[in-house]
Amino acid sequence: PRFSHNVIAINGSAMPDDWQGKLLGADPLHRHLVLSERSVRGASFTTRDLAFPVKNSDVAFRPVYMVNAPDGSVLIADFYERYIAHGQHYQSQIDPTSGRIYRLSAKGKQRDTDTRLDKKTDDQLRQILDHPNKWHRQTAVRLLGQRADAAAHVALRKQIGTESGQAALHGLWALHQAGGLDAANATELLAHPNPLVRAWVIRLQGDRRELSAGFFEAVRQLARHEGHPEVRSQIAGTAFRLPRDQGLPLAAELLQRTDDLADPFIPLQCWWVLERHSENDRAAVLALFDDKKFFRQPMVEQHILERLMRRLAARGRQDDLAGCARLLAAAPTKAHRDKLMAGFSKAIEGQALPLLPDALAKQLRQLDNPPLALRVRLGDEVALGQALGVIADRNKPARERIELIRAAGDVDLSRLKATLLGLVQSESDAGVVTAALLFLQRIDDPALGQAVAGRLADLPAAARSTAISFLASRAKWSGQLLDAVESGRLAKRDIAATIVEVLLDHGNKVADRTK
């Protein structure tokens, strides 16, 4: 594993041809640079390390920063310190004069000497927008933007329209910085053959936080048939920044496609658009689900339903819970209701069920075979009895038993007490014992301390630390913990320093024994 402090994409005429576009990362802890290649992964990419083109056995060699240089090489800043931890820095235990700078370039490659771009005309700068050196391209963009010459706008628009590579993308940036990118021109560029131009024109127009009517409609149409995932990702990212009337329709269009079901970002980007408006514009978000066709979209089924239901239920306000009822009522199939209920169950896990509006209570009662844990949380006495049986049954999956312990413990801990005590005394699964201890800890009963202390020696190892915390949490139980240590049933090394601090807070009687 590594901790890269700086990463650049290599774009320089003095660098090896087969390095162009690859990533170069600075890893000061291992004292080397890492060369990596990129592979497309939907709207993003993955990397694979290829080599360490620069490495040094000198323990003070610390490459921390790199940059594509004006001459086409790569400059490397070496911090040159034996220790680079923060402790040395704020105590001024570093040498501010020892840093070094290296130049990295390919053998036999000429370094570029044409670096006075400020002396060039606008036309000359435009010719540099497809230069192999990243520094030249970016500097030309900056200078054209700073000059903001209206006469250059026409030439830049023409160049963007006729070029398809770097010259088109950098021309777009220059036109934008020079103030020459209007809505009409931006709309035309949505049909540009370079997907990065399409993505960037959407991003730049989105910086205004509201799109013109014509551009918005064009982007909406694009969202339906755009073939490049990076452009779709940018549409989703821009949709998040837009007002409800523009952001929600764009997200809805993307959610009706199946291209991005497995994309690492786009489904969540669409969800964030809905989530952003789910509080202040709840009705507009829920209105999307009045359309059964939208409900059945694979992107909606897999990535949205559970999250939206969970978000509404977690807030717990009456309007939000009414929204949960509306979703359940609109769900076209049991599978959709199950997705919604999975989110609802996660939202209420670990807390008492809030007062439910009549509409939601009605929908929950109408569910086909609702989960036992949910029925327990709804106060179903029969379900609680069934849950106690499952909790005590060692043949049932531990995960199911733990879920029911949490549900029953939030509803009626008094009825659960005897069952949990039995688990502490005989259960072998560490997760189940831990869950039982966490709920029993809420009950003020001296007998519980005796029961837990009596089994300290043979508790599952993963549950023993919880049992120790349990006994230390109350003064009346802490005596049993100290008895276990003094009798040798529990080793002193098992008592963490944090537990000792808790014991010392219980008063002199316990504190004296702790010492």
Regions from the PLM with identified roles:
Residues 77, 91-99, 104-515:
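Long, ordered, helix-rich scaffold segments
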Residues 1-124, 135, 145:
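Beta-propeller domains with acidic blade repeats across secreted/periplasmic ectodomains
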